[in-house]
Amino acid sequence: MAVSAALSGKYSAPGQGNIYAKANEVIVKITGADTNQTFEVVEENCNPGFQSRAHYHIKAFETFYVFEGSADFQVGVKLVHAEKGSCVHIPPGVPHQVTSKNGVRMLMIYSPAGTEGMFAAMHALTQDQLMDAELTKQIALKHDTVMVEQSSDGRGKGTILG
């Protein structure tokens, strides 16, 4: 009888995992396949001046743990400043956005899993395709993520992909 990846355990060394690097470095340390799609663990190293696009997840809970640096988290109507050692938990349906003036290294846990598919799809896009707001919105939606409009031209502020 074969043992599934979810039952055999996994070790992910520093810098090891599925790496998606565009504006920031995103490393998927534990994939959905490792957990029977229960959750996934992602490390993100954000450059100074980083700002994500405002978005929410339809089904997934998202939890952030800050390892280095700091970031401001807009969670619904509340703004939270998170420094090293801070943890921010966001339930499904709650719009959120992350901004870091000086850079931040954080761990993100998504439950259920599925966000890596968005990272992979966005990583495969050309720079011109990444600027196509409708295309990126559709890719995000396919992976449980709804972009929140922030400007009159329909484009969101910030990056869709770390």
Where are these regions (language model features)?
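A short beta-strand-loop-beta hairpin characteristic of the jelly-roll/cupin
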Residues: 51, 57-86, 94
